[in-house]
């Protein structure tokens, strides 16, 4: 669904970002056999930073709370429902005039990639141990030092 905030903007740091009202993503995490694992989505090639892994997320709609936007995007991109997750803390990466909010969450029940319904923006999804991450979206990679301590 197109929103009036679906457009490119430039932040105070001179970076180009999608979402006039900012953006948000859902970072699902769990404890696996090798420690903390995160659920990442492989972005389709035609998308911004396509071919990299990151959180399901996107532009916020007008006056939309970050958690609501992250859940909406995770629903569109992976088929997740609000009842599938337990929301945790939020981490804001503020660039001046534009920000990305990462909403941390845990699965409400067992959740595997085969349980998800990917849309055209996603070409893959998987759980990854924090010490064995694939090629990451550069914005997500830059935020990892702040996010890691929040993951337990």
Task: Please annotate each region the language model reported.
Residues 58-151:
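Unchanged
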Residues 47-51:
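A conserved beta-turn-beta hairpin within the catalytic core of GNAT-like acetyltransferases
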Residues 31-33, 44-46, 92-95:
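Short polar/acidic secondary-structure junctions
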Residues 37-38:
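Entry beta-strands of beta-propeller and related beta-repeat scaffolds
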Residues 16-18, 22, 52, 56, ...:
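Catalytic phosphate/metal-binding cores of nucleic-acid and nucleotide-processing enzymes, i.e., regions
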Residues 1-27, 31-33:
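Acidic, metal-coordinating catalytic segment for phosphate/diphosphate chemistry
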Residues 25-28, 53-61:
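Short, flexible micro-motifs
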